[in-house]
Amino acid sequence: MTGKDFLRRWRLDIIRGVVILGVVFGIGMFIVSMVGRGKAAISDFGHQFDTDFLGADRTHGQPWQYVKALPPDRTLWLRNINGSITVSPTDAGTVEVHAERTFKHSSADSVQIITSESGKGVTVCAVWPGRASDCGPDGHFTAEGMHGNDVAVVFEVKLPRGVRLDASTINGDVSVDGASAPVDAVTVNGDVTVETANGPVTATTVNGDAHATMHALTGPGDVKVTTVHGDAQVDLPSTIDAVVDGHTVTGDISSEFPLTVTGKFASHSLTGTLGKGGRQIQITTVTGDVDVREVGSNADAPVIAPTPPRHPVPPTHRAAPRPRSGTS
């Protein structure tokens, strides 16, 4: 090896090392930024309202109920700020929304629950004092201006078959069972769990797990399951046409489907085409695991290591057979 070849090889190794160091540093800064934002948003809750809305020492206000005929292909928009949302199916052609307001020191009547009806569907909103009363699909709801109010609203919904759902809260879990139309479920501090017969699903949280179960994917649109601090899991039918794209920064990846895992150091990715491909299934987290499982499977999916580079496999040589005893 000449001196020039030696210097050239060392120069390439140094450049490669600098690039790798830059990538690792960038990933580290991304983790710090995302986790910091999530923690800051969650810590703000303590200054704006009481997050313990299931505590035993809370007083219950008058229950609220809304019943309305809602045919398939319509949408139910549900907007909450402090409190959970639970949705289950009904074979009746009417949507039922039950709300329970609880509090410690504030007045339950300080939080109004209002509805807005249109040709596209129905919007139900929990409106805290000092907040705009614009209850509609495009209404913007934040926790700003809620200092000192400890009222929480827990929604329980009966959703007719074929009705789309768009449900959001800031502090609380969102749980949807037995949906049969597209679902968009969002929270900031809490878990999001969606089970649907058709899909597609958008399940989003910042601090909590995001889990979507689809028995089929017949509706138009892509699937997005996203969290920052928590696990992201998707359960799929054994036969499905989709392109899967999953990412985690610090967690593990597991799959019961033939998907390829790549990545070194902290970041891992999961990619692959199922069936004929087509619509996208995106699964993303920062500090949690990514799991892809088959619907109905109770076993833990195997954790998949990043796919190593292929090397030639040397041929195997069979040993010569031993002579049998008693033969010449």
Residue spans of the language-model regions?
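Short acidic/polar N-terminal linker immediately downstream of export determinants
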Residues: 2-95, 100-108, 140-156, 260-277, ...
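A generic structural motif
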Residues: 79, 100-102, 186, 204, ...
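Short, surface-exposed interaction patches in beta-rich subdomains
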Residues: 201-204, 209-328
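Right-handed parallel beta-helix
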Residues: 62-75, 84-88, 110-194, 232, ...
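A generic structural signal for short beta-strands and their flanking turns/coil linkers
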Residues: 93-95, 120, 151-153, 219-221, ...
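Exposed beta-strand and adjacent loop surfaces of beta-rich binding modules
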Residues: 75, 94-96, 110, 164, ...
